[in-house]
Amino acid sequence: MDKKTLNTLEYNEIKNKIEKLCKSKLGKSIANKLEPMIEEDEIRQSLDETYEAMSMIYKFSNPPIYEIINVKASIMHVSKGGYIVPEVLLKIGQILNSVHDIKRYAGESDENYENCPMIMAMMDSLVEEPDLVATINNAIISEDEISDNASRNLARIRQTKRQKTENIRDKINSILSSNDQALQENIVTMRDDRYVIPVKVSHKSSFKGIVHDHSSSGQTVYIEPMEVVELNNELRMLEAEEREEIIRILKEISDRVYDVKDSIFVDQDVLSKLDFIFAKAKYAIEIDATNPKLNTNGYFNFKNARHPLLDKKKVVPISIYLGDDYNTLVITGPNTGGKTVTLKTVGLITLMAQSGILIPVDENSEVAIFDNIFTDIGDEQSIEQSLSTFSAHMKNIVHIVNNITFNSLVLFDELGAGTDPTEGAALAIAILRIFLYKSIRTIATTHYSQLKIFALTEKYVKNGSVEFDVNTLSPTYKLRIGIPGKSNAFEISRRLGLDDDIINNAKEILSQEDKDFEDVLSDIESKKKQIDEDKQRQLELKEDLLKLRDRYEKEIEKTKLEKEKIINEAKENANEIYMRAKEESRELINKLKFLEKESDARTVANDVENKFNKRIKKSSNKKLLNETSKKQKLQLGDEVEILGIEQQGTIVSEPDKKGDLLVQVGILKINANVKNLKKIKEKEVIQSSKSIKSIIKNKANSDIKSEIDLRGKNIEEAIYELDKYIDDCVIVGLKKVNIIHGKGTGMLRKGIREYLRSDKRVKKIEDAGYNEGGLGATFIYLK
């Protein structure tokens, strides 16, 4: 990639921002060496890695990556008989600690492997060494201190040292206390790593010992008393022994590190890369970046692109595309209107994407991969001092023309400026034609009207302009494709106070052709602005309609859910009523089985169950209230009709506080409330009695078989029928029955047997014999 372009577009500023977000020196080193790539697969992988890392940060926050240094040279030094110093061992421990933490950073859910496969694969490649980490942490305290726990021998040596030092101090303190007059100071100090005392020169001869030093004034000599010379010698020997033991420990740990060097090298490289990738992800979050589409067709489409180095709260987004129906874009408009920023935005965003950096554009933007990007952007401060403005630009253009490739992007700022306008415009058109005929993607900014006409008349060339608000005399920085811009020199001058006569005179000097062209531009601009405003209103209206539609859809969904809730609650209530009624029926049936006239009892029980079901159906449709019962007085022995089940009976208990009492209906006693009772006359009682006897007589002969066939039914249907069948069997007194369920898959047999095991009415379950159905049937014995 052209080095001048990288500097002009401030590519290094982007690298610096990413480098600062790296946690480790190795990560920073990768960021510092970053350059744009040209292979699509490499770029796609790098962008996707960054996008995955960004997703993880949003979900799990920043990863636990610590300081990582290059430990390879230190580890390889072990192979030459050396050892690793404590400082580097601590760094190796830090690398391994980071491996441990980052492998647990996101967990190992299927969702992570599906959404972030590349980052998860990198994390999986990390190798943990827990035993080595424990050894390092146990042995190394700091960069220059080894723990007593490193070995038993080291602990013993240091304990002996402490005792020896204490002995020396005791000896010297004894000497100090008995020779106070001879001492310069009553202290113990060190010279040449040996304990000495400061003695006045005048008393030097009164001390037996070795002189190690004297003061700068010559008044003090530092003497090692003979009484401690041997102790000092022993202390020195212990220190030497300590150093040897420390080196032995370091070599032992170093050998263990060397044994797993390949794993540590992988960990170092992967952690460094992860550090760099997550730094790119953090930067992407800062600039609200997205993951663009890529192509090698020379087509790019940036939607609401923002220059990443400008304040994102103030920068005005631009939407720009090139390489589809046109290859050359000519941008015109006033100075400071945003033309140069547009060029730099296009160039820098392209460089970022080709470097695997997510870009500040809206979703579904597309980036073209270029072999090279050439720029001629700058002002007089950036131009070589020895050349004129025009010469400096032209020298740069010559370099571009000589080095251009088919798959290049060229960005010209004020092409043809710095010389005679007529000649400059002609040169600019000729240069643009060179690139146009080679289908090289080119964007150029200019003030020349000739280039506007060139863009209007030449195929595959399009005009563009930066918008200027003449009312506020300020640029809006909005880019418009397809519309040439105006300089607005006359309007700006008038609003700034220039006399109208001067402005009118200037207009007269213009050729009629220039006037007509400017009028056309003004008309186009006005109409374009009106179209844009209409389009914006349509978009707002569409947005309002969409919001309204969404609101109504939500209301409909809410109503639907509420309806379903009401229905479900009603079903639950109905089911509860049914189950309660069924339980009451079962209790009645259990009482009836003790009666002598079993067939009559079954008739009454079935009739009661049917009446209960009838009552349930009625009570779920409307609330039953007996208004007349409130006015009548009921007492013990009264004949009444129970509303809802159409049965008659005799009151056999006094009502409680709630109005509940017992009514004798034939051989049954039924709970009822006075609200649901109606007093009846004697004639009605006689008719009812006859009716009940008639029912019993008609149903007494009903035939209950000793087997039931449940084949072809699902488990729920089979159990429902079986439950009713067992009730009937209990009433008529059958003790052994055969349940035919068939063989099939065995699921029906299994479901029925599970139900029977929980049924208290069943005394015993046994398989049918071979000639009785085998596995396709089950015999049960009832209590």
UniProtKB/Swiss-Prot annotation:
CDD domains: ABC_MutS2. ATP binds at G333, P334, N335, T336, G337, G338, K339, T340. It comes from the Bacteria. Residues 708-783 form the Smr domain. Gene3D superfamilies: 3.30.1370.110, P-loop containing nucleotide triphosphate hydrolases. GO terms for molecular function: ATP binding; ATP hydrolysis activity; ATP-dependent DNA damage sensor activity; endonuclease activity; mismatched DNA binding; ribosomal large subunit binding; rRNA binding. The keyword Protein biosynthesis does not apply. One of its GO terms (biological process) is negative regulation of DNA recombination. Transmembrane segments: none annotated. Its EC number is 3.1.-.-, 3.6.4.-. Keywords: ATP-binding, DNA-binding, Endonuclease, Hydrolase, Nuclease, Nucleotide-binding, RNA-binding, rRNA-binding. PANTHER family: OS10G0509000 PROTEIN, OS10G0509000 PROTEIN-RELATED. Belongs to the DNA mismatch repair MutS family. MutS2 subfamily. Endonuclease that is involved in the suppression of homologous recombination and thus may have a key role in the control of bacterial genetic diversity. Acts as a ribosome collision sensor, splitting the ribosome into its 2 subunits. Detects stalled/collided 70S ribosomes which it binds and splits by an ATP-hydrolysis driven conformational change. Acts upstream of the ribosome quality control system (RQC), a ribosome-associated complex that mediates the extraction of incompletely synthesized nascent chains from stalled ribosomes and their subsequent degradation. Probably generates substrates for RQC. Homodimer. Binds to stalled ribosomes, contacting rRNA. This is Endonuclease MutS2. It comes from Finegoldia magna (strain ATCC 29328 / DSM 20472 / WAL 2508). The gene is mutS2.
